[in-house]
């Protein structure tokens, strides 16, 4: 069976996936340059993600989509199971969003240019001044129902288990006064774990949890950040039937 997967990946997934990526990148770039950034910064990615899920023989289901309002902007925080998380979230989240990305992605042909034109939010790692720049960029993009997706673990899991969350996404949410929505992803680790190049078909699930209220001035930034981080980690860990980190 593994030999079949290798053959299928080489002759079907790789060539068709490359074509899909180029088309999605071009559609995003041209659409955004023509003034349709809000729509074309998102919808080509949705089609791209759905096509990849079907191409890789990995169906998915979404639980809890009714908990979010399409007209509200959120910070979605999800566990990071693998590279396939990107396809799954585009395909199934059902809410316009942008990514928080490292600037190194700008160097990728077609994809980097498309991400820039789509208004993806680039992480500025120059300390406090960099955070302010990131906040300003986010303020320009995250409005009218456009949200952001962040992986607070910071990197893909090597074991399939949840890692401890970092504060960055929650600090940004507190500064922007935006609600946070924990999202549990299951299945992408089995499809394409970190360090593997072999895609293995597997069922996937997105579980959208109840939104956590935005940090208020009365609550204070430090206390609010800790609340959002702790509650998000707890909700996702319990959904995965894993111990809650203290």
For the regions a protein language model found, what residue spans apply to each?
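Short gly/ser/thr-rich secondary-structure transition/capping motifs
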Residues: 56-63, 131-132, 188-190
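Membrane-interfacial terminal anchoring regions of lipid-handling membrane enzymes
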Residues: 1-33, 39, 43, 66-69, ...
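Catalytic core of membrane glycerolipid acyltransferases/transacylases, capturing the structured
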Residues: 21-43, 47, 54-56, 70-128
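Residue-level "edge-of-site" marker
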Residues: 66, 128, 186
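Generic preference for hydrophobic
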Residues: 62, 76, 99-100, 206-208
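Short acidic-hydrophobic, aromatic-tinged amphipathic segments that line or gate anion-handling sites
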Residues: 62, 121-124, 214
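Non-catalytic C-terminal accessory region of glycerolipid acyltransferases
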Residues: 4-7, 132-246
């Amino acid at each position: 069976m593994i030999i079949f997967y290798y053959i299928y990946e080489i002759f079907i997934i790789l060539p068709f996936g490359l074509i899909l990526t180029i088309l999605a990148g071009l559609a995003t770039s041209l659409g955004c340059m023509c003034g349709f950034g809000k729509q074309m910064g998102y919808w080509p990615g949705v089609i791209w993600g759905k096509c990849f899920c079907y191409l890789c023989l990995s169906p998915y289901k979404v639980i809890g989509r009714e908990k979010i309002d399409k007209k509200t902007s959120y910070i979605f925080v999800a566990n990071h199971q693998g590279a396939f998380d990107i396809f799954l979230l585009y395909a199934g989240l059902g809410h316009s969003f942008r990514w928080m990305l490292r600037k190194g992605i700008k160097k990728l042909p077609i994809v980097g240019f498309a991400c820039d034109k789509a208004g993806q939010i680039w992480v500025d790692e120059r300390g406090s001044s960099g955070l302010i720049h990131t906040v300003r960029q986010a303020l320009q993009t995250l409005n009218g129902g456009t949200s952001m997706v962040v992986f607070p673990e910071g990197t893909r899991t090597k074991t399939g288990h949840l890692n401890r969350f970092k504060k960055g996404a929650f600090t940004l949410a507190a500064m922007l006064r935006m609600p946070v929505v924990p999202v549990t992803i299951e299945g992408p680790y089995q499809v394409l774990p970190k360090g593997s190049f072999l895609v293995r078909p597997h069922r996937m699930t997105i579980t959208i949890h109840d939104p956590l209220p935005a940090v208020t001035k009365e609550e204070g930034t430090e206390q609010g950040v800790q609340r959002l981080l702790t509650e998000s980690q707890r909700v996702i860990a319990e959904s995965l039937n894993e111990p809650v980190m203290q």
